[in-house]
C-alpha cells in the first residue's frame, strides 16, 4: 500500500468507527432496505456500449489530492443533469471529505436529480460502509484492491450482492488484475494513475486489459481528455470509461460530455 493510501485508510477507519458508534448494523441495514430500489449500474454500462463507443461513467468531483480544487462552481444536482443530458450512462460521486472535498449529500442530491445509476466513489474499509452506501442511494460501490486484502474485498463484494448493488473492482497492476480474476469480479476498472507518482498513462489499460477476467466488463479510469483518447481505449477491449477532471473543468459540461462520447 502506498503512503497516500495508508493515510487515507487510517483516517477512513477512524471515521467508520465513529459512524458505526452512531448507527448500529441493524439501523444501517434498515436504512439500506428503505432506500429506493437499486438502478442497474453494470446493466446501464452494457446498454450504452456500442462498437466504437465507450459507455461513460461521468464523475462529480470537486477536488483531488493531486490537483487541488477542480471546480469552484460546484452544484452536484446541476452537474448530474448536465451529464445526463450529455449522454452519460452512469454517474460517479465523490463522498470522501478529507482528500476530495466530497460529501454524502452530494451523492444523495445528484442521484435524486437524474435517472442514472450512481456509484459511490469512496474508500471502503469495512462492510458496514456498503450498507451505508445503499442507504445513501448508491447503486454500486468501488473496491480498491490496492488498499485492502482479498478477504475484505470478498466481504465487500458479497455485501454489495446482498443489497442488489454492483461492485467496481479497481486495479493498478498485473498482481491486482490477477486478484480481481480470483475474486470473480465481473466489473473491473483499470486506473491509469500511478498511486505513488500520480502520473497518468493510458498504456496501463493497454497493458492490463489482455489479462482481465474473460467475462468482466472492463472500465478504463483516469487520463481521458480527448476523443482520440477514447478511440485508443476502445481498441483495448474496454467497454466503459470513467472521466471526471476533463469534464469538470469545462464551463459547458453537457457539450463537453457529448463531444467526448461522439
UniProtKB/Swiss-Prot annotation:
EC number: 4.1.1.48
Top EC group: lyase
Keyword Amino-acid biosynthesis listed: yes
Cited InterPro entries: Aldolase_TIM, Indole-3-glycerol_P_synth, Indole-3-glycerol_P_synth_dom, Indole-3-GlycerolPSynthase_CS, RibuloseP-bd_barrel
GO molecular function (one): indole-3-glycerol-phosphate synthase activity
Keyword Amino-acid biosynthesis: yes
Family recorded in the similarity comment: Belongs to the TrpC family.
Catalytic activity field: 1-(2-carboxyphenylamino)-1-deoxy-D-ribulose 5-phosphate + H(+) = (1S,2R)-1-C-(indol-3-yl)glycerol 3-phosphate + CO2 + H2O
Species annotation: Caulobacter vibrioides (strain NA1000 / CB15N)
Pathway participation: Amino-acid biosynthesis; L-tryptophan biosynthesis; L-tryptophan from chorismate: step 4/5
Gene that this polypeptide is encoded by: trpC
Spans traversing the lipid bilayer: none
Alphabetical UniProt keywords: Amino-acid biosynthesis, Aromatic amino acid biosynthesis, Decarboxylase, Lyase, Tryptophan biosynthesis
This protein's name: Indole-3-glycerol phosphate synthase
GO BP: L-tryptophan biosynthetic process
Amino acid at each position: 500500500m502506498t503512503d497516500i493510501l495508508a493515510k487515507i485508510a487510517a483516517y477512513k477507519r477512524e471515521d467508520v468507527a465513529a459512524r458505526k458508534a452512531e448507527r448500529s448494523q441493524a439501523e444501517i441495514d434498515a436504512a439500506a432496505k428503505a432506500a429506493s430500489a437499486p438502478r442497474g449500474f453494470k446493466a446501464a454500462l452494457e446498454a450504452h456500449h456500442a462498437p466504437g463507443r465507450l459507455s461513460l461513467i461521468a464523475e462529480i468531483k470537486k477536488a483531488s489530492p493531486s490537483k487541488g480544487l477542480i471546480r469552484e462552481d460546484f452544484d452536484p444536482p446541476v452537474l448530474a443533469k448536465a451529464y445526463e443530458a450529455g449522454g452519460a450512462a452512469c454517474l460517479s460521486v465523490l463522498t470522501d471529505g478529507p482528500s476530495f472535498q466530497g460529501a454524502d449529500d452530494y451523492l444523495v442530491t445528484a442521484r435524486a436529480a437524474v435517472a442514472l445509476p450512481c456509484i459511490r466513489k469512496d474508500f471502503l474499509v469495512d462492510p458496514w460502509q456498503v450498507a451505508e452506501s445503499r442507504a445513501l442511494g448508491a447503486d454500486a460501490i468501488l473496491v480498491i484492491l490496492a488498499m485492502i486484502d482479498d478477504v475484505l474485498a470478498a466481504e465487500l463484494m458479497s455485501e454489495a450482492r446482498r443489497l442488489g448493488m454492483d461492485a467496481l473492482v479497481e486495479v493498478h497492476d498485473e498482481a491486482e488484475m490477477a486478484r480481481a480474476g480470483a475474486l470473480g469480479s465481473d466489473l473491473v476498472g483499470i486506473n491509469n494513475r500511478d498511486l505513488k507518482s500520480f502520473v497518468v498513462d493510458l498504456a496501463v489499460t493497454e497493458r492490463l486489459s489482455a489479462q482481465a477476467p474473460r467475462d468482466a466488463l472492463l472500465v478504463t479510469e483516469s487520463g481521458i481528455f480527448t476523443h482520440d483518447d477514447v478511440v485508443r481505449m476502445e481498441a483495448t477491449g474496454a467497454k466503459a470509461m470513467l472521466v471526471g477532471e476533463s469534464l469538470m473543468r469545462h464551463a459547458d459540461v453537457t457539450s463537453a460530455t457529448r463531444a467526448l462520447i461522439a
